[in-house]
Amino acid sequence: MKKPPVPLLQGGVRADGRAPDQMREVQISVGVISNADGSAMVSYGATTAVAAVYGPREMHPRHLSLPDRGVMRVRYHMAPFSTKDERKSPTPSRREIEISKVLREALEPAVMLEQYPRSRIDVFIEILQADGSTRVASLTAASLALADAGIYMRDLVIGVSVGLVDGTVVLDLNGLEDQYGEGDLPVGYMPNLRRYTLLQLDGAWGRDKLLEALNLAVKGAEFVYQKARDALKNRYMAIAEEIYGR
């Protein structure tokens, strides 16, 4: 494993000044794309994801529709300018295709697709800037965009990441920690139902460290959930003021 350019953890303080159990600054806006049925922008530190939802609408071609439920399609894409790496092709990479599938599977437990037979719901996610934890920021953004579109949902899905850095469990991996840490665990969590929808373990984790990581992920998800609720509330209040003038 390559040595990181700076110590990732020193004296209980991470390279970016955070404590191990601390999120980066979280910023959430809902209703950011006027021509989408629902949209949201989520930033975890420098990582920024924008999600747009279109639907429900009739499935085309019709033979792909399901008689008892809707079909949700998710596309995750990193903008060419989102990282310092040169992107040689505009076509989706294998990683983007894989993450698109992972995100769809993480969102489906929260979406009442049985309410939309023979219909489709399209979710488009664009990473504007990447500094670690892109898939979990995308998960939160997509969940909020679905809620903004008025899609029937059992709960929001909040995405957070936890990882192992110098043997310490840390919350919300930045790019350096993602690249040089010993392990990472992206988590999708429904705070009201207290259910996980995404657990992707990478690296060597002992039982105690894994339990610590899951507890820390729940703590982080509940923190983000409060900000997500506030963002939705602000969105609905703005709509009500626009309609009713109060």
From Swiss-Prot:
One of its GO terms (cellular component) is cytoplasmic exosome (RNase complex). Coiled coil: none annotated. One of its GO terms (molecular function) is RNA binding. One of its GO terms (biological process) is gene expression. It is found in: Cytoplasm. Transmembrane segments: none annotated. It comes from the Archaea. Its EC number is 3.1.13.-. Keywords: Cytoplasm, Exonuclease, Exosome, Hydrolase, Nuclease. Gene3D superfamilies: GHMP Kinase, N-terminal domain. CDD domains: RNase_PH_archRRP41 (cd11366). PANTHER family: EXOSOME COMPLEX COMPONENT, EXOSOME COMPLEX COMPONENT RRP41. Component of the archaeal exosome complex. Forms a hexameric ring-like arrangement composed of 3 Rrp41-Rrp42 heterodimers. The hexameric ring associates with a trimer of Rrp4 and/or Csl4 subunits. Belongs to the RNase PH family. Rrp41 subfamily. HAMAP family: Exosome_Rrp41 (MF_00591). Catalytic component of the exosome, which is a complex involved in RNA degradation. Has 3'->5' exoribonuclease activity. Can also synthesize heteromeric RNA-tails. NCBIfam families: ECX1. This is Exosome complex component Rrp41.
